[in-house]
Regions:
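Membrane-water interface segments at the C-terminal ends of transmembrane alpha-helices
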Residues: 22-23, 27-29, 68, 72, ...
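Hydrophobic alpha-helical segments of integral membrane proteins
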Residues: 9, 51, 55-73, 77, ...
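Residue-level signal for discrete positions within transmembrane alpha-helices
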Residues: 12, 95, 99, 135-142, ...
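An internal, D/E-rich "acidic patch" concept
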Residues: 58-115
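Histidine-centered metal-binding segments
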Residues: 313-353
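N-terminal signal-anchor/signal peptide hydrophobic helix marking the start
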Residues: 6-16
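Alpha-helical transmembrane segments of integral membrane proteins
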Residues: 2-3, 94-129, 168-314
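Hydrophobic alpha-helical transmembrane segments of membrane transport/permease proteins
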Residues: 15-66, 160-176
Length: 353
């Protein structure tokens, strides 16, 4: 498994390097002269040329790219803001905690709401509970986060005066941003959890667990959910990365001093060092999240851990009976109509009670 982690780390470094080259190239070839934005309109040609030389913008593309990569990955220096005159690394260090605070809380809320919604929908497939849960998920996915953010500001801050609208502080400053940032992930997790649970709900080991007289809650959370976790973990990892990237909008709406606001202001001012630094940080974060997701697979599925350890597939299958072999079991049991499943769910609930 150590070799796999090392291989993935090397791949992560390669991805980040490619992302760095791409963002540098895009910024380099953006039309317009950033020096004219930095200098006053009355500046002479000589002053503009002097400023361009001091920033290194008069050097060839490959020279600038090489200097940027060397400074970023050898000296860990992302440069100095052209507008603020401060270190980009220091600016990111000040703002990253606010962004991660928002992202972590949002993915926790998404998981605590979205996964139970999906489970409830799956165990009551085609019943009214299923329809209600999926309707909630569809609404969460469909509503734009910036629109719900503005709506909450108007309602809870301006009209009712319950919550502060802008800035940072105590927990009350986080309630509306976290809700706005987590809505899409709630819907996505609910749908994925339902789909994953339906893949295992009619598996042989689930039928056996019920035949042993286990309570329905035990069957769901000890036998179904663990075997449905792989796709759910994938969605959680992707949602977390999406939430962090989506803070560009949320932080602007709620005036939070995070990376999103930092990046937006840099784009407005054409402050290229900040733009490049923010994109690199987001690329590193996304790549690390994907690595953590892959490692989480090994925690919930012993077969994957065995593969990471270099064991052959034949040896992995030799110890059969693993309930994780659960793909598409439900397709082999087509004799159950919708009403029967609703009745089964109701019986299971009565038994659980």
């Amino acid at each position: 498994m150590g070799k796999y982690v090392l291989r993935r780390l090397l791949m992560t470094i390669l991805v980040v390097l490619v992302a760095s080259v791409v963002v540098f190239t895009l910024v380099y070839f953006v039309p317009g002269d950033p020096v004219k934005i930095l200098m006053s309109p009355e500046s002479t040609v000589a002053e503009l040329e002097a400023k361009r030389h001091s920033l290194g913008l008069d050097r060839p593309y490959l020279v600038q790219l090489g200097n940027f990569l060397y400074n970023a990955y050898i000296k860990f220096d992302l440069g100095t803001s052209w507008i603020r005159g401060t270190s980009v690394v220091e600016g990111l260090a000040e703002r990253l905690p606010y962004t991660f605070q928002l992202g972590v809380l949002a993915i926790l809320v998404s998981s605590l709401i979205g996964i139970p919604l999906g489970i409830n929908a799956a165990v009551h497939q085609n019943c009214w509970q299923d329809r209600v849960c999926m309707l909630i998920g569809m609404v969460c996915t469909s509503v734009p986060d910036f629109w719900i953010a503005l709506l909450m500001i108007v309602l809870f801050s301006q009209k009712l005066n319950w919550l502060p609208a802008f800035g940072v502080g105590g927990i009350t400053y986080l309630i509306m941003p976290v809700i706005a940032a987590s809505l899409k992930s709630i819907g996505t997790l609910a749908r994925q959890t339902r789909s994953s649970m339906l893949e295992v709900i009619r598996s042989d080991y689930v039928t056996t667990a019920r035949a042993k007289g286990l309570k329905e809650r035990s069957v769901i959370y000890k036998h179904m959910l663990p075997n449905a976790l792989i796709p759910i973990i994938t969605v959680i990892g992707g949602s977390f990365s999406g939430i962090i990237a989506g803070t560009v909008v949320i932080e602007q709406v709620f005036s939070r001093p995070g990376v999103g606001t930092y990046l937006t202001q840099a784009i407005t001012n054409r402050d290229f060092p900040i733009i490049r630094g923010c994109v690199i940080i987001l690329a590193i974060f996304t790549s690390v999240m994907m690595l953590l997701v892959d490692l989480a697979y090994a925690v919930v599925d012993p077969r994957i851990k065995a593969q990471y350890a270099g064991q052959s597939r034949k040896r992995s299958h030799k110890h059969g009976g693993n309930p994780h072999h659960r793909h598409h079991h439900h397709h082999d049991h087509g004799g159950h109509d919708h009403h029967d499943h609703c009745e089964e769910s109701e019986k299971g609930e009565r038994k659980d009670g």
